[in-house]
Amino acid sequence: MAAEDREMMEARGAGESCPTFPKMVPGDSKSEGKPRAYLEAESQKPDSSYDYLEEMEACEDGGCQGPLKSLSPKSCRATKGQAGDGPKPAELPPTPGTERNPEMELEKVRMEFELTRLKYLHEKNQRQRQHEVVMEQLQRERQHEVVMEQLQQEAAPRLFSGGLQNFLLPQNQFAMFLYCFIFIHIIYVTKEMVFFLFAKHYLFCIAAILLCLIKTFWS
């Protein structure tokens, strides 16, 4: 059985990766009514007998057991692609990861810009608040100084007049005793001075008294 299979494969032609395509006869009535795409699809179908024989040969060489499995069309397509008989595979679309990378970079840049802008605004607000606090303190100090100056100007005459009156009024018994002692001492000193002047300079005192009397009566 294996020898017959090998002979059949040699008859088909050694070195072919996929079954040969049937040639189209120009006078074939069946092929005239079918479109070209349909004929090409039929010509690209793998030969089941060839797949079966190839699988048989592989099992004999490898000593596999169990039922034989027919080759998948994917393997046949791969062999066709390697041999250059089949159509070229279409280019794979770009993965979503490669498309998202620029978007993620743009999002990161935008977030960094927003963070820097918010940080700048926060610092600006802090500086403005500090400036406002300092200006309020200076304004309060100036207002306090102005009020104190006004109070001092208003209280200066009152303190002089009221202070003198309060000083002359005795506040307690000791102040009253002090005032009496000073008054008596002033009277005693004045009397002694008058007696001394009349005793030593009586002529001068008499002349002064006469001048005062003449001036008083003359006026």
UniProtKB/Swiss-Prot annotation:
Membrane spanning stretches: 167-187, 194-214
Statement: the UniProt record of this protein carries the keyword Membrane: yes
Protein name as annotated: Transmembrane protein 247
Organism of origin: Homo sapiens
Ranges of compositional bias, category Basic and acidic residues: 1-10, 29-45
GO CC annotation terms, alphabetical: endoplasmic reticulum; membrane
Pfam families in the record: TMEM247
Disordered: region residues: 1-101
Coiled-coil region(s): 121-156
Cellular location(s): Membrane
Major localization listed first in the record, in broad terms: membrane
Entry keyword set: Coiled coil, Membrane, Transmembrane, Transmembrane helix
Database matches in PANTHER family: TRANSMEMBRANE PROTEIN 247
Membrane topology, record value: Multi-pass membrane protein
Classification of source organism: Eukaryota, Metazoa, Chordata, Craniata, Vertebrata
